[in-house]
Amino acid sequence: MATTTAPSRQLTQKEADIQMMLAADVHLGTKNCNFQMERYIFKRRNDGIYIINLGKTWDKLNLAARIIVAIENSQDIIVQSARPYGQRAVLKFAQYTGAHAIAGRHTPGTFTNQLQTSFSEPRLLILTDPRTDHQPIKEAALGNIPTIAFCDTDSPMNYVDIGIPANNKGKHSIGCLFWLLARMVLQMRGTIRPGLKWDVMVDLFFYREPEEAKQPEEDEVAAPDYAIADFNVSAIPSDGQWPAAIDQPWNDAVPQPIPAVPAVNWAAPEAVAGDWGEAVPPPQQIPTAGIESVPATGWE
């Protein structure tokens, strides 16, 4: 009996994104679980690691993208990451979506102290880790700023309005999440047509070691040229015969000898220009003819 193979079905956008998240270890949680994150847990492995339901992760990413698109001015959105693995992803996300990025340590009072030069009042705050970025979350709560954060299984959910369940500790996971969120935002804005592949690779959102960034720069530096200089070897005939000018006499080319230094009699007495014992003549007085004496003013 002949067996017929079913044609390969093309994956939907959601299925392709979930496969990418699986490859980036977005589904791996921690050994601890917050009670508010239990609804996003798929199962628990034998080693104690909680597995996150990526279907709910994709739905939360879609919801967060809709909220970002609803804000007219992109500069009113602040995306922030104090974790080193998320700083490059934050900068790339801000580059493609037009948001304002804060990569590094948060300055206390940025959202509450109006006397600071870096004071700002955003309409939306996007964070990488609620535990690491606890200071901006508290300030956003005081200023009634909605907050979107990537939450791991052990992340606190206090003052987080939209928590996206995902692994927020891996460099590949964070880069993949920000890449998916940026692509969804651009698709909803109409910059990217739905169903078409985004020409920006996800690797650009990944964290890079400082040594890896310096290596291409060192390779681009041109090595010094230590090759032997060209001394016009082509001028020498290939038949081995030297030109006739070499056979000419060389007498005229010999330089004249340097004349000898005249002999000096060092025993002769040294001639003295004058007698040092003579008296020095007295100084001569300069005539003051024509110069009138200045009358006394009485100030002395």
Swiss-Prot record:
InterPro entries given in the database record: Ribosomal_uS2, Ribosomal_uS2_CS, Ribosomal_uS2_euk, Ribosomal_uS2_euk/arc, Ribosomal_uS2_flav_dom_sf
**GO MF assignments:** structural constituent of ribosome
Q: Keyword check for Lyase, yes or no.
A: no
Keyword vocabulary terms for this entry:
Cytoplasm, Ribonucleoprotein, Ribosomal protein
Any single Gene Ontology cellular-component annotation = cytosolic small ribosomal subunit
Under the subunit heading, UniProt states: Component of the small ribosomal subunit. Mature ribosomes consist of a small (40S) and a large (60S) subunit. The 40S subunit contains about 33 different proteins and 1 molecule of RNA (18S). The 60S subunit contains about 49 different proteins and 3 molecules of RNA (25S, 5.8S and 5S). Interacts with ribosomal protein S21.
The identity of this protein, by name, is: Small ribosomal subunit protein uS2
In which organism is this protein found? Cicer arietinum
Q: What's any GO biological process attached to this entry? A: translation
Which function does this protein serve? Required for the assembly and/or stability of the 40S ribosomal subunit. Required for the processing of the 20S rRNA-precursor to mature 18S rRNA in a late step of the maturation of 40S ribosomal subunits.
Recorded hits in Pfam families, A to Z, give: Ribosomal_S2
Localization annotation: Cytoplasm
Q: Key word Disulfide bond present in the record? A: no
CDD domains assigned: RPS2
Question: Region Disordered: which residues?
Answer: 275-300
Family designation: Belongs to the universal ribosomal protein uS2 family.
